[in-house]
A protein has these predicted regions:
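Outer-membrane beta-barrel channels and translocator barrels
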Residues: 18, 97, 108-109, 143-147, ...
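A beta-strand signature from Gram-negative outer-membrane beta-barrel systems
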Residues: 1-24, 97-99, 112, 118-120
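Membrane-embedded beta-strand positions in outer-membrane beta-barrel channels/transporters
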Residues: 8-10, 99-101, 135-137, 224-226, ...
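Outer-membrane beta-barrel initiation region
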Residues: 90-94, 104-108
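An active-site-proximal structural segment forming one wall of the substrate-binding cleft
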Residues: 237
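Short, glycine-/polar-rich solvent-exposed loops and beta-turns at beta-strand/coil boundaries
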Residues: 1-5, 93, 129-132, 165
Length: 277
């Protein structure tokens, strides 16, 4: 660089070009497409047949086996009726995002300025998830025969939201012979609410949590300002000074209402401990 000496290299940004005001803009559209081709999951009939052949519905105690066989027949009726839920696609979407870049510059041989702004909106493949980023900057420079002033201001903003539909692995574990809604079209909170049959807890429907007022967001703001001055009263003497300011703030906001399925096992003395913030 122009200031390199004794093994020190100083990198400076490109100065705005002098002359008339110049404006430029670029934009693009982005797609986030889920790829499920690597997932080979069983359909409802295959899953039920695997459970039967593995002895899942067998029990040495006659009264237990009768109940299990009854449950098997209930599920088989659902399968024969055409129930075959492909859970992997339920929380997914094709995310459509966009990016924009704007630049403004101008000035004269003594005073030059430029301003830039970039906005990027990324829509995730999980429903209602996103990440939005804004970067802006203003560069100013002023030159005389003896003085040079430069100021660079940059601002970065970011906001992200996780999907209220939970995590994708929750849907991979769901049985295809379960239905997402009841006979009235309402999203189920639990599947087959048979506590004894499932051995301890109700299997929950992660789609139900998306109907609640859940929240999981984060954001941050970065601001940087660098000022430099160069004074050269004579050819053999140069005085340089720099001053910089940097600040960052960040926040997270996570809320789960008491009705969230993660608190389904909170009973008796823990009932009023449901919910988190």
């Amino acid at each position: 660089g122009s200031r390199g000496a004794n093994g020190v290299i100083v990198i400076t940004t490109k100065e705005p070009e002098p002359g008339k005001l110049r404006f430029s803009y670029t934009g693009s559209l982005n797609l986030e497409v889920p790829d499920l081709s690597d997932y080979d999951v069983l359909n409802a009939r295959e899953k039920l047949d695997l459970e039967l052949r593995s002895g899942y519905y067998d029990n040495v105690r006659a009264e237990k086996e009768v109940a299990l066989k009854q449950k098997y027949n209930e599920i088989l009726q659902q399968v024969e009726r055409g129930v075959n839920t492909y859970w992997l696609s339920k929380p997914l979407r094709v995310g459509i995002g966009h990016r924009h870049n704007i630049k403004l510059e101008g000035g004269d041989p003594s005073f030059r300025y430029s301003a830039t702004a970039q906005y990027n909106d990324v829509a995730g493949v999980m429903k209602e998830s996103f990440r939005r980023t804004f970067n802006g900057g203003i560069n100013l420079s002023y030159k005389t025969s003896e003085l040079i002033f430069r100021n660079q201001l940059t601002i970065s903003l970011n906001k992200a939201q996780e999907s209220p539909y939970g995590t994708f692995d929750e849907y991979v574990k769901l049985n295809p012979y379960w239905t997402a809604t009841d006979e009235n079209g309402n999203i189920k909170r639990f599947f087959d609410e048979d506590y004894e049959y499932w051995g301890g807890s109700y299997p929950a429907n992660p789609l139900y949590n998306a109907t609640l007022n859940t929240k999981e967001t984060s954001d941050y703001t970065n601001i940087t300002n660098n000022f430099s001055m160069e004074w050269k009263p004579i050819q053999e003497f140069t005085l340089r000074g720099t001053f910089g300011i940097y600040t960052q703030t960040s926040n997270t906001d996570n809320y789960l209402p008491p009705e969230h399925t993660s608190f389904a096992d909170y009973t008796d003395e823990n009932y009023f401990r449901r919910g988190s913030y």
